[in-house]
Every structure is written in structure tokens, then in C-alpha cells.
Design a protein with these regions (language model features):
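Ubiquitin-like/PB1-type beta-grasp interaction modules and other compact soluble beta-rich domains
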Residues: 1-96
Length: 96
């Protein structure tokens, strides 16, 4: 098992247990767990996720988590273009 820290932003918090909303929390993960696996295991549908950062770097859903990773998970962006940062899909969820 490895331990990673997670933080979900904006409306993604609606999918989380109340004690995890709006704050960073630690979670144990299977040794080969991917970002997608853990996001969904925490109750957030991956289809609602636009950007995942692990230790400040944009990653795809296939990124295997390591002990001590800090995972930030973001929903659709409305105010600015994040296309150059995306690693979880080919184009933004929301088109301007």
C-alpha cells in the first residue's frame, strides 16, 4: 500500500464524503493504483474531471500513484483555456 494526498476542487466536492470536501486528505492506495482508479474509488466520476496534477505536474488517468504523491483534481474550466495542460483527454470538456 502507498499513501497519497488528494484535493478536489469546485463542484467535484459534491461527489465526496462531507469530511473530505474543500480540503486535502490522505488516502491509502493499492501499490499499482492509477489516478483514475483512485478518483473513481473516492466517488468522483472520471468523466467530470478535466485536469489532474500530481506533485504539480499535469498527468493522465493512467499515472500510477506513488507514496507521498499530492493529487489535485479539477473539473471543467470555464474562464480560461487549459488545452495545453491536458493529459486526461484530447480537448477540453467545455468548448468556448
Amino acid at each position: 500500500m502507498v499513501s497519497a494526498r488528494f484535493r478536489f476542487y469546485e463542484e467535484l466536492n459534491d461527489f465526496l464524503a462531507p469530511q473530505h470536501r474543500g480540503r486535502e486528505f490522505s488516502r491509502s492506495c493499492a501499490r499499482a493504483a492509477t489516478t483514475k482508479h483512485m478518483i473513481e474509488a473516492l466517488g468522483v466520476p472520471h468523466t467530470e474531471v478535466e485536469l489532474v496534477l500530481v506533485n504539480g505536474e499535469s498527468v493522465g488517468f493512467d499515472r500510477i500513484l506513488h507514496d507521498g504523491d499530492r493529487v489535485s483534481v479539477y473539473p471543467k474550466f470555464e474562464a480560461f483555456d487549459v488545452a495545453p495542460l491536458l493529459r486526461v483527454r484530447d480537448r477540453p470538456l467545455r468548448e468556448s
